[in-house]
Amino acid sequence: MTVLQEPVQAAIWQALNHYAYRDAVFLAERLYAEVHSEEALFLLATCYYRSGKAYKAYRLLKGHSCTTPQCKYLLAKCCVDLSKLAEGEQILSGGVFNKQKSHDDIVTEFGDSACFTLSLLGHVYCKTDRLAKGSECYQKSLSLNPFLWSPFESLCEIGEKPDPDQTFKLTSLQNFSSCLPNSCTTLVSNHSLSHRQPETVLTETPQDTIELNRLNLESSNSKYSLNTDSSVSYIDSAVISPDTVPLGTGTSILSKQVQNKPKTGRSLLGGPAALSPLTPSFGILPLETPSPGDGSYLQNYTNTSSVIDVPPTGAPSKKSVARIGQTGTKSVFSQSGNSREVTPILVAQTQSSGPQTSTTPQVLSPTITSPPNALPRRSSRLFTSDSSTTKENSKKLKMKFPPKIPNRKTKSKTNKGGITQPNINDSLEITKLDSSIISEGKISTITPQIQAFNLQKAAAEGLMSLLREMGKGYLALCSYNCKEAINILSHLPSHHYNTGWVLCQIGRAYFELSEYMQAERIFSEVRRIENYRVEGMEIYSTTLWHLQKDVALSVLSKDLTDMDKNSPEAWCAAGNCFSLQREHDIAIKFFQRAIQVDPNYAYAYTLLGHEFVLTEELDKALACFRNAIRVNPRHYNAWYGLGMIYYKQEKFSLAEMHFQKALDINPQSSVLLCHIGVVQHALKKSEKALDTLNKAIVIDPKNPLCKFHRASVLFANEKYKSALQELEELKQIVPKESLVYFLIGKVYKKLGQTHLALMNFSWAMDLDPKGANNQIKEAIDKRYLPDDEEPITQEEQIMGTDESQESSMTDADDTQLHAAESDEF
């Protein structure tokens, strides 16, 4: 028995769209066994890839010569997923053995898929440290399709500064049209018509969801060719032969359910359902909020307008359900194989859960207006193609109706109780068309086309405006202009602001500013509104680590690991949880697990490096930080970690170099400037160190670490009065920090005011008798202080000589304060 290719393809896509991957794979394998074509090969590989079997798709495509752009792109995608970057590059751009393809060559070869192809190629270039080429590919991809976000995101992450105003714009009609699907929905809104002429709203049948289970394929005594008449091979996906359209209850577009859909779900692109219709996101007023699973709201409008003339409800039509104007066309349910002049369209069923008011589908008859070179949608090729024709004498497909509707072999009639004149007047306006225009296959649709295009353009421009604002905020964040990023993102519309992605970026910005309380507040809101979000939670876990909130951190790590054990963010949170409990060995295992889950996750390498520093395994820590830099050269946290190790090893020149490298990436970090100042002071560059610390304090005037180090440098340079003034200001910021009082006591002793010195030494000892609860050390990073190491107590320091006091300040306090900031980043 010959397999019908098109129905099987539609069934496969339906299974894929309903996530029935096993069924899709099985059917695709059967189809490929029957028809060894490029299309069947691509469909089978797609099923493998979507079911998570990229290696199967790779081997399948690799074993066959891929000549179509779709197969090439999918094979390259599999190569990238399997870390075969060189092979993927050769497929997309030619590689070493073939001529290198230019961007124009790629656009010519891949057509509408060129924007995605260039984005994938840019990813390959960036992974192989060819950032300039990668940047060019990303920029070209955005110029072809400004609706893409990931290329812009990647440009920002590699250090480029794309202009959102120039990136997210519709430069031309061609640019706009290339981003639209081949088939769109039609919306004709003409309020100037009489109320007696209801408006017709046409929605296409959902793509690739033809209900094949309602088709009764009669194969006995008949043979079906794989294709039908080539004259209708380019029609829209909703235009299906009447013999093949499954009928069901509630399909009439004249039902009130079109207007009375339940208003559920978010509005366009994430707006809440309660959003006022007077404040649309993208420049147009939403006609109705889609129900969950209803994709018609995001579909564009076609350039054709199809209208019908409804017969009187009291006298059901004997020939058809709906007629075109006054012409005597053949019945839309005619069983003749010769009726090819007019191909009817079945309007998509409404998804309303309310009572059905119509039991007979309304069939519209549009003209074929798609261009000859337009590719039909997958669902439209159910029984249409251009390679062969259906025999006129072949038996037609028989409809299987729902149980409530008897299977009629005669022409369908309008149910008297299904449609009433008030229903028509309340819901739709119908325009009658001249029969001569219909017979010629032409419909005057200039006005509806203009209206539809204007609506499309307004919606697209609204989206571009939103992407521009979000792009500016993300660019500022990647440039570490955190305050600017917070300001931009905070001014987004409330329904976009209150989403997980936006709030995570704001929380990350607060984290980079060391405003951990604000960051914790933002991330907790993310957890409230999107408790399924994993991205960004590694920053949240580090924020909780800084705030010493062990209970909240434990709850977070438990929830994340239960939700997704294949997420590196979850294991990073678990590692931070045990690190806070000083269970460093367990924390190391969890960070290693995060790396095992995602070897390209730079932050896991950084956290693992900090844990190795705590266990004094500096060589392993160096290897971790270097791996983080290998994965992401702009990961300044790893450069900082290397600098800290070299500082601990008293390799101050190397430490300064690595700190400076981190500062080049994040020039707004007061903490990095502070560390550079400390290293410069260790290199006997005291004046330069003071200038650096002054810059750090300008960026963050209330940073206690910077002020403490500046006071220490002033004290070392014998500028006691200036040091004392600095410490008095610092005492107002951290009134319970014992080290501040201890340094004040040392200053007073140098000034000869012994009684004041003893008083401050006593206060320092009262605040921290064992020297183990210093806020500055803990807030910055107590991880660099081994568990069994206790700071020199104030009593020991008071009893020692001046030289021993200075040494203890430098070795015990100063070094720990500077060198212990790993999770500041």
UniProtKB/Swiss-Prot annotation:
Record field: compositional bias (Basic residues): 396-414
Location(s) in or outside the cell: Nucleus; Cytoplasm, Cytoskeleton, Spindle
Keyword terms, alphabetized: Cytoplasm, Cytoskeleton, Nucleus, Phosphoprotein, Repeat, TPR repeat, Ubl conjugation pathway
BP GO annotations: anaphase-promoting complex-dependent catabolic process; cell division; metaphase/anaphase transition of mitotic cell cycle; protein branched polyubiquitination; protein K11-linked ubiquitination; protein K48-linked ubiquitination; protein ubiquitination
Comp. bias intervals (Polar residues): 326-341, 363-372, 381-391
Organism: Bos taurus
Gene Ontology cellular component list: anaphase-promoting complex; cytoplasm; nucleus; spindle
Protein function: Component of the anaphase promoting complex/cyclosome (APC/C), a cell cycle-regulated E3 ubiquitin ligase that controls progression through mitosis and the G1 phase of the cell cycle. The APC/C complex acts by mediating ubiquitination and subsequent degradation of target proteins: it mainly mediates the formation of 'Lys-11'-linked polyubiquitin chains and, to a lower extent, the formation of 'Lys-48'- and 'Lys-63'-linked polyubiquitin chains. The APC/C complex catalyzes assembly of branched 'Lys-11'-/'Lys-48'-linked branched ubiquitin chains on target proteins.
SMART domains named among the record's database cross-references: TPR (SM00028)
Superkingdom of origin: Eukaryota
Region Disordered, residue ranges: 305-423, 782-825
Residues recorded as bearing Phosphothreonine in the entry: 205, 209, 244, 313, 367, 431, 447
Quaternary organization: Homodimer. The mammalian APC/C is composed at least of 14 distinct subunits ANAPC1, ANAPC2, CDC27/APC3, ANAPC4, ANAPC5, CDC16/APC6, ANAPC7, CDC23/APC8, ANAPC10, ANAPC11, CDC26/APC12, ANAPC13, ANAPC15 and ANAPC16 that assemble into a complex of at least 19 chains with a combined molecular mass of around 1.2 MDa; APC/C interacts with FZR1 and FBXO5. Interacts with RB. Interacts with FAM168B/MANI. Interacts with MCPH1.
Name under which the protein is recorded: Cell division cycle protein 27 homolog
Top-level taxonomy: Eukaryota, Metazoa, Chordata, Craniata, Vertebrata
Chief location of this protein within or outside the cell: nucleus
SUPFAM superfamilies, A to Z: TPR-like (SSF48452)
